[in-house]
From Swiss-Prot:
It is found in: Nucleus. InterPro entries: DNA_clamp_sf, Pr_cel_nuc_antig, Pr_cel_nuc_antig_C, Pr_cel_nuc_antig_CS, Pr_cel_nuc_antig_N. It holds the Pfam family PCNA_C. Residues 262-365 are annotated as: Disordered. This protein is an auxiliary protein of DNA polymerase delta and may be involved in DNA replication as its carrot homolog, typical PCNA. The larger PCNA is perhaps processed thus bestowing on it exactly the same function as its homolog. Keywords: DNA replication, DNA-binding, Nucleus. One of its GO terms (molecular function) is DNA binding. This is Proliferating cell nuclear antigen large form. Residues 61-80 bind DNA. GO terms for cellular component: PCNA complex. Its main location: nucleus. Residues 282-301 have a biased composition (Basic and acidic residues). Belongs to the PCNA family. It comes from Daucus carota.
Length: 365
């Protein structure tokens, strides 16, 4: 039996509103420690992790671990029927196929209940390793949201650079360029208004603004946002939900064309077979370049070790062995569920090869 009673019903509404446009269907996992969700978007570029600890609920009963598949859009519709001050109670049987939402007004003069059918969603929990980041920026969440919104009127990508001078957000578009610099500022009346920068090394990464703007929908949940950056890892954008938990967004960086061409030059030279067509002629050199609008997910994004892979297989991005001379090459099938629009950015996934302990990526037609 599962029974959760949350006095701050409006908080659950805000959580759903902040993730429903990124993920359509997901499993909510309930255990003795709390109520959680982890899911990737359909393009396998972003991942969202939500945790609401059991201590934050007025009443929390979970007899055994249970996973409930839900359509987040439908769940958000039901929660919109609750007032911001209503008390929300969720109930589900261990082997049931529905979940019940009950909304009570603060004066308890109005009680509503809604039933929603659960879904059977085939997904697996991904391993996210604990990592040390080269730079961590803490700043007001409203300011970060405003920066992302303003830059999206100029371009469709943002370059986040952290140096001794501060953190710079830059973009470039058809009409021009924009640069916004935020310097460390701790001389404020309220701690949540401070901008704090912790830097081990300078870092500069490029991200899609449409994802960043989607992340900022969690702004009503927290006064501050924490942005963790490292050149070899996806960015982490975290909003703490008071003392109750958090929402964390992980986003793979975009790979610029000039960097990609340099990184792939050596592997291409060492793999003549990958650089020749079926008739033995070499492909055009331009084919080895990667479009700057395409992304690649780093290996750290979906798994923390080979052992974790055995215990927790990757979700959605299932692998298949390429039939050919080299049976060790694996190709990730990350085709989105729906065909992208003309303006959408499509991720191009590439096989990985080991070289001196580092993972290198190379283009294979």
């Amino acid at each position: 039996m599962l029974e959760l009673r949350l006095v701050q019903g409006g908080l659950l509404k805000k959580v759903l509103e902040s993730i429903k446009d990124l993920v359509n269907d997901a499993n909510f996992d309930c255990s003795a420690s709390g109520f959680s969700l982890q899911a990737m978007d359909s393009s396998h570029v972003a991942l969202v992790a939500v945790l609401l600890r059991s201590e934050g609920f007025e009443h929390y009963r979970c007899d055994r671990n249970i996973s409930m598949g839900m359509n987040l859009g439908n769940m958000a519709k039901m929660l919109r029927c609750a007032g911001n001050d209503d008390i929300v109670t969720m109930k589900a049987d261990d082997d049931g196929d529905v979940i019940t939402f009950m909304f009570e007004s603060p004066t308890q003069d109005k009680i509503s209940d809604f039933e929603m059918k659960l879904m059977d969603i085939d997904s697996e929990h991904l391993g996210i390793p604990e990592s040390e980041y080269e730079a961590i920026v803490r700043m007001p969440s409203a300011e970060f949201a405003r920066i992302c919104k303003d830059l999206s009127t100029i371009g469709d990508t943002v370059v986040i650079s952290v140096t001794k001078e501060g953190v710079k957000f830059s973009t470039r578009g058809d009409i021009g360029t924009a640069n916004i610099v935020c310097r460390q500022n701790t001389s404020v009346d309220k701690p949540e208004d401070a901008t704090i920068i912790e830097m081990q090394e300078t870092v500069s990464l490029t991200f899609a603004l449409r994802y960043m703007n989607s992340f900022t929908k969690a702004t009503p949940l927290a006064n501050q946002v924490t942005i963790s950056l490292s050149s070899e890892l996806p960015v982490v954008v975290e909003y703490k939900i008071a003392e109750m938990g958090y929402i964390r967004y992980y986003l793979a960086p975009k790979i610029e064309e000039e960097d990609e061409a340099a990184n792939y030059a050596q592997p291409a030279q060492n793999s003549a077979a990958a650089a020749t067509s079926n008739n033995g002629t070499k492909k055009n050199e331009g084919n080895n370049k990667v479009d700057s609008k395409k992304r690649a997910i780093k290996s750290e994004f979906v798994d923390d070790s080979e052992a974790a892979t055995d215990a927790q297989p990757q979700a959605k991005a299932k692998t298949k062995t390429e039939a050919g001379e080299d049976d060790d090459v694996e190709v990730m099938d990350t085709k989105p569920k729906n065909e992208p629009d003309d303006g959408d950015e499509v991720m191009e996934t590439k096989p990985k090869t080991e070289s001196n302990g580092e993972v290198e990526v190379m283009d294979i037609e």
